[in-house]
Regions:
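Outer membrane beta-barrel
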Residues: 101, 105-241, 247-249, 268, ...
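Repeated loop/turn-to-beta-strand initiation elements of outer-membrane beta-barrel proteins
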Residues: 73, 114-118, 185-188, 237-242, ...
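Transmembrane beta-strands of outer-membrane beta-barrel pores
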Residues: 81-87, 114, 124-128, 192-196, ...
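Outer-membrane beta-barrel "beta-signal"
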Residues: 231, 401, 466-496
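Detector for outer-membrane/organellar transmembrane beta-barrel domains
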Residues: 296-423
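Residues that define the transmembrane beta-barrel architecture of outer-membrane proteins
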Residues: 98-102, 169-174, 223-227, 258-262, ...
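Residues on the lipid-exposed face of transmembrane beta-strands in outer-membrane beta-barrel proteins
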Residues: 81, 104-110, 175-180, 229-233, ...
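N-terminal periplasmic/intermembrane-space "pro-region" immediately following the signal or transit peptide
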Residues: 14-96, 107, 111, 115-117, ...
Length: 496
């Protein structure tokens, strides 16, 4: 309750934290942001570190001397309330599942001078449609949608038991980092932070530094930060940036030195093309390599990224039988750990054009190849049951088409997005229409509707019906997950 009281007490206007641009993810008009002032040279006759020394025999005013900024602390946050209803096949209107995930972020941003910055962001999560343990009170429900758009198969299956592993509400730490420079040459960011790699819109195989994959159909990135120490070395003369990173909690918290991960990334501007290459080693696991580029090609912007995995990040599963009443779940599948290498690659093109005076639109297409994926949907129940299911990264081939446009009235700050994503391996699809309207300066209203279609049992048109089974001698009641026909969602977001 102390954390809750503290967060609710935080108010005021401030700058947003270092997050991936939600406009770049969702097609809204890009809002210009003021750049932080560049560090200036030390005053003539003074050393850069003179301000850190105390002058004997007299007091000094740190604010007048410029050592501490007058507005050193900023406070702000985000209130984000969503409401999602999913129409399921064969369900009456009164039994239609709903979810109302609430996210409240509060941050403190300290900038005592232009070379030091500290940032902390706490997050409260709550869903009034779930009980205190995060479970629906009736039926299968939609589960926890705090980090999900509910576009694919569920991440867990109803098993007739109550889980007490999640609290509702729940407070989590999103970001907590300190940033400073070493002689204005090397820039250090240490702590729990957001760092996203990759240039593709929907699928980012090179996004190595997060323990979660981004849901591309969410309005903006809701993932929590990860703890790391990042050293950035800009080489402006060569148009190059070099990043060296130590990972502390990816893929798991490092309780020993041997569990730490190390990553290196180099970015370079070559003509009009932006190129990047990275390498990653984590806790004795096989190394991972990646590369990406983006460049103009005539009227189009093209981009691509690829990752090479030295080994499979987890077991590979295959079915060994069909479920029969009373059978043990473990007898229905087998697991193996194949050796690499494995490749994931995505790429696409987009075309920007004016669709009316002062109104822009973007059309694009993207493809994703996933050698770590599966060729059909029959294995999905096993992946969900074992906790190995990864939405948008389970199939072998994916594709997407989209069109996003600014609304006709430039003073109403509206945007529309039409998108279709398909798991080409299992033949399931989802088509979606999104609307966004920013009003009263700080409020954003969101609405969307989507339709699931294609092969039943596929990722985007999932269904599952099983008889009563057992798991290690414990009974598992029959599971019935009907097909979701369509979803309707509303959202209200306040940024302050």
């Amino acid at each position: 309750m102390k954390v809750l009281a503290l967060l609710l007490a935080l108010s005021g206007a401030a700058r947003a934290g270092d997050r991936p641009s939600e406009d770049s993810l969702f097609g809204a008009p890009a809002a210009s942001t003021a750049a932080a002032p560049a560090p200036g040279p030390a005053p003539e006759g003074r050393s850069r570190d003179e301000g850190r020394e105390l002058t004997p025999g007299r007091s000094r005013d740190a604010f007048l001397s410029g050592e501490v900024a007058n507005d050193a602390l900023s406070i702000g946050g985000t209130f984000y309330q969503r409401w999602v209803v999913s129409k399921q096949e064969g369900q009456s209107a009164k039994n239609t599942p709903e979810s109302m995930p609430l996210q409240f972020d509060a941050y403190m941003d300290a900038r005592p001078n232009d070379r030091v910055r500290g940032y902390v962001q706490e997050r409260i999560l709550y869903d009034p449609t779930l009980d205190q343990y995060g479970n629906p009170t009736k039926g299968g429900g939609l589960g926890n949608l705090q980090y999900s758009s509910n576009s694919g198969a569920p991440s867990s299956l109803p098993a007739g038991t109550t889980s007490q592993t999640t609290s509702n509400p729940m407070a989590v730490l999103d970001q907590a980092w300190l940033k400073f420079d070493l002689d204005q040459a090397v820039f250090v960011t240490a702590g729990k932070q957001h760092v996203k790699w990759g240039v593709s819109r929907f699928w980012n195989p090179t996004d190595f530094l997060s323990t979660q994959r981004r849901d591309p159909l969410l309005p903006y990135d809701l993932r929590l930060g990860n703890t790391m120490v990042k050293l950035a070395l800009p080489l402006e003369k060569y148009g190059t940036n070099v990043y060296a990173i130590t990972l502390v909690d990816n893929p798991a918290p490092a309780s020993t030195v041997g569990q730490l991960g190390e990553a290196l990334r180099v970015e370079k501007l070559v003509g009009n093309a932006e190129m990047g290459a990275e390498a990653l080693a984590r806790g004795g696991a096989p190394p991972t390599f990646g590369a990406d580029f983006s460049a103009p090609a005539g009227p189009f912007d093209v981009y691509a990224e690829a990752a090479l995995f030295g080994g499979s990040p987890g077991p590979r599963y295959r079915l060994t039988g069909e479920p029969a009443a009373g059978e043990d779940v473990s007898s229905l599948y087998a697991a193996s750990n194949p050796r690499g290498p494995f490749v994931q690659a995505s790429g696409g093109a987009r075309y920007d054009f004016p669709w009316m005076e002062n109104r822009q639109a973007t059309a694009g297409a993207e493809y994703f190849f996933n050698q770590l994926g599966y060729g059909g949907g029959s294995i999905y129940p096993v992946l969900i049951f074992t906790g190995s299911y990864r939405p948008f990264y389970t199939g072998r081939h994916y594709g997407a088409l989209y069109l996003t446009a600014e609304g006709p009235d430039q003073f109403k700050h509206t945007s529309y997005t039409f998108s279709t994503l398909g798991n080409l391996s299992d033949g399931s699809f989802i088509s979606r229409v999104d609307f966004s309207w920013r009003f009263l300066t700080y409020l954003t209203f969101e609405a969307y509707a989507d339709e699931h279609y294609g092969t039943k049992g596929g990722e985007f048109n999932f269904e599952l019906h099983t008889p009563a089974l057992t798991n290690g001698g414990a009974p598992v009641p029959p599971i019935n997950v009907p097909t979701t026909l369509y979803d309707v969602g509303l959202g209200l977001r306040l940024s302050f």
